Amino acid sequence: MCHSCFLIQQGRIADGMCRPKHPKFKLLKTPFKETDKLTYNRVYINQYLVGFGIGFYPDGRLMYFYSKDGYALKESDVENKKWENARNIGYWRTEGDKIKIEYFVCSQQGTYFREQGEIKSDSIVFYQTLFSPIKGKVVRETYYVLSDMSFE
């Protein structure tokens, strides 16, 4: 039996860009509020997986960056990137120092990733609550630090 025949593709990749077929960003239901806590049009780099980064626009949009070679994110991975040609896009919302992001990736037939965290000066910390049978509730922190890399 063909199990994959019943999977619904929610996203598509065209010209290196991943987009949802029918956008359903839940975060767009949250009213947008301007903030001065983020630095716009610059890349925040994941401190553990340095091949990943996030860039914020002042209007609530974001781009998620990946290293082309699988190693550290470089200027060449970011240059000439804008909303229209970014591999992955999403949205952000803030409430004080708290931030929520949501972005779409085409893996697993298309998935929306949602993260919550807080803005701390030139860094953003996202928290994920996990359960370990040995330790119980565990909170994993993922740090993104502001870099010198910029985009349009």
Stretches with model-predicted labels:
Residues 5-89, 95, 100-152:
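Lipid interaction determinants
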